[in-house]
């Protein structure tokens, strides 16, 4: 699928950001085990790519995926997909360090929903957040622990993240309207 709009990150730059996120996680947790949990949709391939980089330094990184559709407080933003309901997490999360992974952090509502969903599977000892892009505009007091790019944008601006696993290519684009951002 072709994407129009101003390109903010190239495929190579996205790969560099993912590697940097992985190394920041390793620096903060050199010996502590953690679980990377990708938020459905584009958080899942990001978590898998982070795990692949982390595996080079620390084999056995656990990953999971989390569908938050039923936990959202903005149902008009929820999109049902063929993967709806597909949450896969390793074992019980009780006492685990969980690192949530998503592509873009905006209002914080997705992350709030993800935290609510996680607690259905056990009470983690700690939850951290890794995002490819923080675009600002928070409505809830949520901040990333690991961030590839901070790109402050107004409400009238939209980002489109493309990942090769889902879209055939990597890229981050500033697009004109909300429909181009999905």
Predicted regions and their residues:
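PRPP-associated nucleotide enzymes
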Residues: 1-182
């Amino acid at each position: 699928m072709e994407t129009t709009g101003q390109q903010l990150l190239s495929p190579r730059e996205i790969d560099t950001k993912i590697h940097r996120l992985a190394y920041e996680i390793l620096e903060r947790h050199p010996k502590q085990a953690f679980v990377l949990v990708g938020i459905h949709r584009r958080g899942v391939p990001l978590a898998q790519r982070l795990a692949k980089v982390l595996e080079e330094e620390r084999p056995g990184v656990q990953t999971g995926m989390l569908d938050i559709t039923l936990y959202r407080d903005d149902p008009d933003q929820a999109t049902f997909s063929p993967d709806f309901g597909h949450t896969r997490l390793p074992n019980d999360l009780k006492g685990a360090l969980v690192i949530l992974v998503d592509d873009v952090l905006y209002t914080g509502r997705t992350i709030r929903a993800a935290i609510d969903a996680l607690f259905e599977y056990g009470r983690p000892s700690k939850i951290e957040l890794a995002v490819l892009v923080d675009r600002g505009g928070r409505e809830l007091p949520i901040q990333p622990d690991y961030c590839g790019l901070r790109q402050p944008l107004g409400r009238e601006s939209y980002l489109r993240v493309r990942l090769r696993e889902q879209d055939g290519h990597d890229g981050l684009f500033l697009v004109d309207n909300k429909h181009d951002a999905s």
